Amino acid sequence: MSKIVILGGHGAVAMIAGRKLVEAGHQVTSAIRSADQKTEIEAIGATPLVLDLQEASTEQLDAAIAGHDTVVWSAGAGGAGAEITFAVDRDAAQRSVDAAQRAGVKRSVMVSYQGSSLEHGLSEDHAFYPYVQAKAEADETLRRSDLDWTILGPGFLTDDEPTGTIGLGPLEEFGGDRESAGPNGERNISRSDVAQTIVDALDMTETVGKFIEYGRGDTPIREALAR
C-alpha cells in the first residue's frame, strides 16, 4: 500500500484516479481548492485536504506532502488566463516538486499533455503560449529532480467510455500540429483511460524517467506502458 497525495484532486481525471487507487488498496489524500468539494472526495474513499495550490505557502505545501510516499500532479488552471496559468501550471507545479524532495518522497507522476516541450515553437502572443510554456517548464523541473518521475502526455480528453487501451506515440504521429485532432480522432482519449494510466504507471518501474505520450489506441494500458 502506498500513501498517495493527488494535487488537483477534484479534477475529472483525478476523481477517477483517486477512486481507482483507493479500490487498489492505497491510502489517498486528495488536495482540493474548496471545502465544498469534501463530500465528493469522501465518497470515493479518499481523504480531502483543502489546499489552494495557487496561494499555498511553502509551509502549507510541505505539510500537505509530508507523510506521503507518492505525489500525483493533476492540477491545472483550466484556461483561466495567462497569469493564473503560469501561477498554477508552472509555479505551483514546480513548488510541489521541491516540496516532494524536501519531504523525502521518491515517486511522482505528473499529468502533462501530448507534445509538451520547451521547443514548442509558439510565439508569446499565441493563445496557447501560456499553457504550453507553463507545462513545459514544470515538466523540465520534474525531469531535473531527484524523484522517480513519470510524465504522462495524453491527447485531447473526452468523456467517452474507457477502452482500457491506448496508443503510444509523439504528437506528430497523432495528427500533426496542436490544433489537429487527426482524421480519426487518434489524439483523443477518455479521461477514464488517462486515470487508469496514472494508476498503472505508479507501480511500474518501467515508466520511471519517461515522458509517455499517448492517445486512443488498441494496446492494453499496462502492456503499452511497459514498452
Predicted feature descriptions by range:
Residues S190-R227:
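Alpha-helical substrate-binding/gating segment
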Residues I4-H26:
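N-terminal Rossmann NAD(P)H-binding glycine-rich loop of SDR-like oxidoreductase domains
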Residues L7, Q27-T29, A35, A77-A87, ...:
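Conserved Rossmann-fold NAD(P)-dependent oxidoreductase catalytic core, especially the SDR/UDP-sugar
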Residues E124-Y129, Q133, F156-R191:
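SDR active-site lid
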Residues I32, G153-T158:
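Conserved SDR Rossmann-fold cofactor-binding beta-strand/turn motif
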Residues H120-L122, D159-L168, A201-K210:
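Glycine/proline-rich active-site loop of Rossmann-fold NAD(P)-dependent oxidoreductases
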Residues S30-R95, A99-R102, L202-E206:
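NAD(P)H-binding glycine-rich loop region in Rossmannoid oxidoreductase-like domains
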Residues A93, A134, L152, P183-D200, ...:
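Substrate-positioning beta->alpha
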